């Protein structure tokens, strides 16, 4: 009660600060965001605080500060996002999602993306399934229409495409209602994603050499899958086929580029292949714990492996594509985590280990990190499989005691004497 006697008057005073008190109002936005949890317990005080933050968003545009540009969203945007997450049900009941029209293209993109994520959480907290579907579609429609128009335009700028993908991602990542509300019905994000699938495919073809666009596109895929979880299954086959085809085409273009460089002709640009491999890892994360999905995922890993092996044929190739090396071996490690039996009993494991032995000769921190991580996971999975089967462990593993902290070398001299 004593806190209430201080917090409520402080918030009321903050909301009445004059517009020209810029520094005080910015700190007021921080105060409101800090007490989002308190506001949830006192819903009658939410509306004036929200109105204050909306005014602050518009003021930041009209009266930019002389300070160095913030790398993240403004204080008002972060506070408003915090309120959306903490007070989602209350704001959903007040139809707060309508404020989208006030902020789109009227505030800096970072602020807009932050608030869109919050609005996604508000939509997910709606009382009925129909309201969640309607709200998700309302939030996604403007960037979806803009992205479709850009996909058909010959003069589309990659940055403009990336911005629309960012907006869609912001909506999809938080618009996930509870399983009780879904009750077996289609996930609202999946419906939006499925309707946009032809547009996504067109963008991936049209902008295949743009690292910015492909990375943003795959990030959108990732958050759609994470939001839908198991509800993404109807799109899984199309997703894996698309990722594999994009990876194969990119590898073919990269190999053609290497050949053209050798014969002195012009180098052809290729897509950021690691983004497609990372998305395949997300497929494993979301569906690798279901036994019936293992054959499908193993087929995906096999296809990804063949494509990567076609490009990574020497230490020089490993050094040229360190991001692909890192993501590929993390993909293989993740499959071992979820489905060890399929890979340990497959000839594919030998090919991966052979590729890893080549990668160990590359002096690149990120690439080596992925290769070494896989080697460690593979060893651990193999030992665990042997223990479960009851077969004897190799002498090197059964006789030596595990290394202790005290056994670690403490100086270069210790290493030289070892």
Where are these regions (language model features)?
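Karyopherin-beta/Importin-beta family HEAT-repeat alpha-solenoid scaffold
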Residues: 1-418
